[in-house]
Regions:
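N-terminal targeting/docking segments
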Residues: 1-2, 19, 86
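Bacterial N-terminal signal peptides that target proteins for export
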Residues: 1-10
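Sec/Tat signal peptide C-region and signal peptidase I cleavage site
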Residues: 15-21
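The canonical Cys-X-X-Cys-His
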Residues: 131-142
Length: 147
């Protein structure tokens, strides 16, 4: 009975967290980008030989990035231009179609390179180069520099 109560409490808290995240797109995208960055750091450390190649960690990174690509277009509704540690350029809302196309290109690069990345360190290096170009393309146009 106690276990059921604990599990029910956890379920409710997770649902509340999800609802809060959905109602605050700025916070949601900030958290998403922080998660992306954490995964990127692990992958880069592998590429530099600072930690051993680990296919499970690479898969986790690519899964995170694939999820990000799916969520990105919906995380920039009108009215979410300000708030939080918002580095989103106003150009996103002025050129939303282009922004969404860049998010789709990121998703395609992640999908196209995922198997290669998980297979070997050499594949990871090639995959990250391809995926990184799509990250840079969007960040160069649509991310403000740190204040």
């Amino acid at each position: 009975m106690i276990l059921r109560t604990i599990l029910a409490g956890l379920a409710v808290s997770l649902c509340v967290t999800a609802v809060i995240a959905q109602t605050d797109p700025v916070k949601t995208r900030e958290n998403l980008m922080k998660e992306n960055d954490q995964h990127a750091k692990v992958v880069v450390q592998m590429m530099r030989g600072q930690q051993p190649f680990d296919a499970k960690k690479v898969e986790a990174a690519f899964a995170q990035w694939a999820d990000t690509a799916k969520q990105l277009p919906g995380l920039f509704p009108k009215g979410s231009e300000k708030g939080g540690d918002n580095r989103a350029s106003p150009k996103i809302w002025q050129n939303k179609k282009d922004f969404d196309q860049k998010a789709a290109a990121f998703g395609k690069a992640v999908a196209d390179n995922r198997a290669k990345a998980v297979a070997s360190l050499a594949g990871l290096k090639q995959a990250v180069a391809a995926v990184g170009k799509t990250c840079d393309s969007c960040h160069d146009d649509y991310r403000l520099s740190k204040r």
